[in-house]
UniProtKB/Swiss-Prot annotation:
One GO MF term: DNA binding
Presence of keyword Secreted: no
Homology family: Belongs to the HrcA family.
Name assigned to this protein: Heat-inducible transcription repressor HrcA
Protein function: Negative regulator of class I heat shock genes (grpE-dnaK-dnaJ and groELS operons). Prevents heat-shock induction of these operons.
Keyword Nucleotide-binding: no
GO terms classed as biological process: negative regulation of DNA-templated transcription
Gene: hrcA
PANTHER family named in the record: HEAT-INDUCIBLE TRANSCRIPTION REPRESSOR HRCA (PTHR34824:SF1)
Source species: Bacillus pumilus (strain SAFR-032)
Keyword annotations from UniProtKB, A to Z: Repressor, Stress response, Transcription, Transcription regulation
């Protein structure tokens, strides 16, 4: 259990290191308004904090820097969300006031806002395609027995699939098929298309098209292969180059390689998490993230979580400010998407 004096010294060390990226010595601490103890007392308390594992010494300086354990204690017990400036709030609100009719553009906008305001890297995990509904399907003949199905969702996502029919279909048959699919499947969730097709489309195919069973098989294969993965949106991919910790070429290379690997990035998100979570250094379970912290928030519609929005920064990131920014951006993103889905 830390004493009040140790808590104060730890908090001041971390706040100063977040601001300056320079190790903090007892002389620096003695000049702080909040610190009224003697230099000898400060040195003794710092020695105790180091022995307890909350701060550590660097090789190149006599000062101390926070350890991962120190950051975790700070986040869990000492952190207060930072009040955002009126300019920051206006920037966030104005970005979502712009009329955007596609989910993906709205989500990308939120990633860009966060990276601009934090100067860190932001990642938004978009909703799974199964959360989208089919808005329209277009069929474009490319060969006598082939057509490209262009599926457009209510989020603005576009997916192209090649349909191979066992028999030749003329243009009028393609048009009939397209009209039937749009009349019965528009508004249906993407992961329910195949089931709905066998329940509602099959009778119309039988009535209006010959060889309907072959057409049904071809459509079934197409809808089965529809992607169900979440899409990743990034903001400020190279922002970490501006952070002193990442002037080390090997360190920044590892992080850049991680960001380019979708499977690795997906490991940073947990499907059942709610609210705002903070993972520090090794807690991310990825070697490239050992010098980084990840703060994640969820966004939702009608209390149903759709995806996650995250900020990657150095372990000395400004936690209080980033937590506040994530809170506001995730809330405004949720409101913007609710309005989009209601239209």
């Amino acid at each position: 259990m830390l004493t009040n004096r140790q808590l104060l010294i730890l908090q001041v060390i971390i706040n100063d290191f977040i601001r300056s990226a320079q190790p903090v010595g007892s002389r620096t601490l003695s000049k702080k308004e909040d610190i009224t103890f003697s230099s000898a007392t400060i040195r003794n308390e710092m020695a105790d904090l180091e022995e307890l594992g909350f701060i550590e010494k660097t090789h190149s300086s006599s000062g101390r820097i926070p350890s991962e354990k120190g950051y975790r204690y700070y986040v869990d017990h000492l952190l207060s969300p930072r009040k955002l400036s009126s300019n920051e709030l206006v920037l966030i609100q104005s970005a979502f006031q712009e009329k955007i009719f596609e989910l993906e553009k709205t989500v990308q906008k939120s990633a860009e806002i966060l990276s601009d305001l934090t100067n860190y890297t932001s990642i938004v995990l978009g909703p799974k395609l199964s959360e989208n509904r089919l808005k329209q399907i277009q069929l474009v003949p490319v060969q006598p027995n082939k057509a490209v199905a262009i599926m457009i969702t209510d989020s603005g996502h576009v997916e192209n699939k090649t349909i191979t029919f066992s028999e030749h279909l003329d243009v009028s048959d393609i048009e009939k098929l397209m009209n039937i699919l749009n009349s019965r499947l528009a508004g249906v969730p993407m992961d329910q298309l195949k089931d709905r097709m066998y329940k509602e489309v099959v009778m119309l195919l039988r009535t209006h098209l010959k060889d309907y069973d072959h057409i049904l098989d071809a459509l079934g294969n197409t809808f089965t292969s529809t992607q169900n993965e979440s899409k990743l949106f990034f903001g400020g991919k190279i922002n970490m180059l501006n952070q002193p910790e990442f002037h080390d070429i090997d360190r920044i290379r590892s992080l850049m390689m991680l960001i380019e690997q979708k499977n690795d990035v997906m490991q940073l998100f947990h499907p059942n998490q709610q609210g705002i979570t903070i993972k520090i250094g090794s807690e991310n379970n990825l070697e490239a993230m050992e010098n980084c912290s990840l703060i994640t928030a969820t966004y939702s519609i009608d209390q149903k979580s759709l995806g996650s929005i995250a900020v990657i920064g150095p372990t000395r990131m400004d936690y209080g400010r980033v937590v506040s920014l994530l809170h506001h951006v995730s809330k405004d993103l949720s409101n913007a998407l609710s309005n989009l889905y209601d239209e």
